[in-house]
């Protein structure tokens, strides 16, 4: 089958931020997304009663809303867009006694008790995936970056795969699951890959190979739409973007901006390499798979595999080298401040580390963890 790749301006940006709705007193998940979305629409008279807000969306579970930016030129613009949408949500949730937070998972609310949004595609997903599908009490951040040529898509995807453990380690924020410490930095990473077509992307040498794969998925009934290919990094042909979906949910707008800047800078760097006739190295899939597991297990303490030769380095050391290398790219894109915020995540600890600290300070009380995440979203990162 032929798959067109939409025209897109190079290195433009879009961000999706999935937020959990919780009871402000107990910290338990609150399945009130429908009420929140109705309230948001009511506060915007330009929308009809049944119209969906263009930047505030439904998700799989009724305890979730998703903030979606428009097409942005800079990370600062994307952050401002998300901030405006978050304020619109708060106009509705504050009087309801509902708070919002973001992490890779909820620390203690039972996954099996969370109602699913009443839509045919969600019902089909749960019917097919059963127990695993009902466990998807997970939240993430997705970053789209525009590509100006279809020929760049697969090499850029391969380039981002090389940085999979960096994104996973920085964002890891799901150490707890159903009230238990899993021992992992990111439970979400290993949970989400249980769904059909989720997980690491395949490697393709040509766009025709990718088209053939998609055709096979349609022919065998694996997917009904191309969006059901839920890889951790994927092309989005109708938008003309590459979408980085690796990250656990991020607690603050500052952290979302940092991850968006790192994504935008890497994609722009890869694009420039290709424009200049260069190539982007790839790693064997067994190294890629191992890197995903190491980052999910150990987070910022992971020793990662750097290349096909099997050279290894502490992920934070390689991140700092990468940030230095990307400084000129960030200056060109206008995201130097946001890229510098990546180093702040390293210095104060990723979400999984901060959650464990709060739990330890409160005798293992995971309600305190949720309330701290709520506070971070309102006030910014805690030291």
UniProtKB/Swiss-Prot annotation:
Catalyses which reaction(s): L-cysteine + L-glutamate + ATP = gamma-L-glutamyl-L-cysteine + ADP + phosphate + H(+)
Statement: the UniProt record of this protein carries the keyword Transmembrane helix: no
EC id: 6.3.2.2
Keyword presence, Cytoplasm: no
GO molecular function per UniProt: ATP binding; glutamate-cysteine ligase activity
GO biological process: modified amino acid biosynthetic process
Listed Pfam families: GCS2
Keywords of the record: ATP-binding, Ligase, Nucleotide-binding
Domain of life according to the entry: Bacteria
Function: ATP-dependent carboxylate-amine ligase which exhibits weak glutamate--cysteine ligase activity.
Annotated family: Belongs to the glutamate--cysteine ligase type 2 family. YbdK subfamily.
Protein name: Putative glutamate--cysteine ligase 2-1
Source organism: Arthrobacter sp. (strain FB24)
Upper lineage: Bacteria, Bacillati, Actinomycetota, Actinomycetes, Micrococcales
């Amino acid at each position: 089958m032929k798959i067109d790749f939409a025209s897109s301006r190079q290195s433009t940006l879009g961000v999706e931020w999935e937020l959990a709705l919780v009871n402000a007193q107990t910290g338990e998940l609150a399945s009130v997304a429908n009420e929140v979305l109705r309230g948001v629409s009511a506060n915007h008279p330009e929308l009809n009663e049944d119209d969906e807000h263009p930047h505030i969306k439904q998700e799989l579970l009724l305890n979730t809303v998703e903030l979606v930016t428009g097409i942005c030129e800079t990370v600062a613009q994307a952050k401002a867009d998300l901030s405006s949408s978050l304020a619109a949500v708060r106009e509705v949730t504050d009087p309801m006694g509902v708070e919002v937070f973001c992490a890779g998972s909820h620390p203690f609310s039972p996954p099996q008790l969370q109602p699913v949004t009443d839509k045919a595609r969600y019902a089909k997903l749960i019917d097919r995936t059963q127990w695993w599908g009902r466990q998807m009490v997970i939240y993430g951040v997705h970053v789209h970056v525009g590509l100006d040529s279809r020929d760049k898509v697969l090499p850029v995807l391969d380039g981002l795969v090389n940085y999979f453990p960096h994104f996973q380690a920085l964002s890891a924020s799901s150490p707890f699951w159903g009230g238990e410490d899993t021992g992992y930095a990111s439970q979400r990473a290993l949970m989400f890959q249980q769904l059909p077509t989720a997980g690491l992307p395949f490697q393709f040498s040509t766009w025709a190979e990718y088209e053939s794969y998609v055709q096979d998925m349609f022919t065998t009934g694996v997917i009904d739409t191309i969006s059901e290919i839920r890889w951790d990094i994927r092309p989005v042909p109708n938008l003309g973007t590459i979408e980085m979906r690796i990250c656990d949910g991020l607690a603050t707008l500052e952290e979302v901006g940092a991850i968006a800047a790192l994504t935008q800078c890497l994609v722009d760097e890869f694009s420039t390499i290709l424009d200049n006739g260069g190539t982007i190295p790839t790693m064997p899939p067994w190294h890629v798979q191992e890197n995903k597991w190491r980052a999910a297990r150990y987070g910022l303490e992971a020793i990662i595999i750097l290349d096909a030769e099997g050279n290894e380095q502490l992920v934070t050391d390689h991140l700092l080298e990468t940030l230095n290398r990307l400084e000129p790219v960030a200056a060109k894109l206008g995201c130097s401040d946001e890229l510098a915020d990546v180093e702040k995540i390293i210095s104060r600890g990723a979400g999984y580390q901060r959650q464990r600290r709060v739990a330890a300070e409160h005798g293992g009380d995971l309600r305190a963890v949720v309330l701290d995440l709520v506070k971070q979203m309102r006030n910014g990162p805690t030291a």
